[in-house]
Amino acid sequence: NNVGWLTRHLASGGLPAVVPLPATSLGNITASSLLGSSDAITMNSASDYRIDGFHWSWEEDDSANGLVGAVTRMHALWNSNATQLESAGMETMASLDLLRPINFGLYNASSNPGGYQPTGGANYELSYNSGFGDQLRNIAQLIKSNLGMRVATIDLGGWDTHVGQGNPANTYDYFGNQVESLSQGLSAFYTDLASASSGNLMARTSVIVVSEFGRRVQENADGGTDHGYGNVMIAL
């Protein structure tokens, strides 16, 4: 069985067995580090985490948080743990019930007065990769919601720069833009949690930035860098 290292950590950490939301993976697919976990929720965006695809679903009043009528009816459909499929269905419904009431949109006095307000002046509007900023904001909000989240992952792509890595002197700096987005996002996340109204949440939060492979120092013939063997990690 393919079991991720974070999944193994959760199983061996001696942590309380039951919490509402122990793990989440922000992205299109579950992070490899959380493979094998039956507790991890995978979603690209917390505000879009819903059941969709029903007739006229785009006209549903609560479409941003899930189709309430459909969700209610599906509880009866999956109301059994007799099979693995039914158990998975019940777990999905439970996660929808947990997240649907939370307003993950940004605060706006007129259009979204119940939205999320980052603290300490944290700004998740990045120069590039705006989706990364939104995902970091979602995680910060989930941490502040006291749902028991122990681990969360985000997949920030775009680092496989074999061609056209960029050169600031030529006003095209693809790699630099990637690093800028990463830096801005981490700064906003740190500021938001460190200044939380409930106290400095960064004091009990660790952030690890890791790539699946390194890159060579020497530039290749296509203005990029090829795969290397060594790599570094960033820890906050």
Language model segments and positions:
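Beta-strand elements within well-structured catalytic alpha/beta cores of enzymes
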Residues: 151-156, 206-212
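Residues at or immediately flanking beta-strands
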Residues: 23, 204-206
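A structural signal for short secondary-structure junctions
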Residues: 146, 199-203, 225-229
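Feature for exported/extracytoplasmic and membrane-associated proteins, marking the mature portion
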Residues: 1-183, 188-198, 218, 232-236
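Histidine-centered active-site microenvironments of extracellular/periplasmic hydrolases
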Residues: 211-236
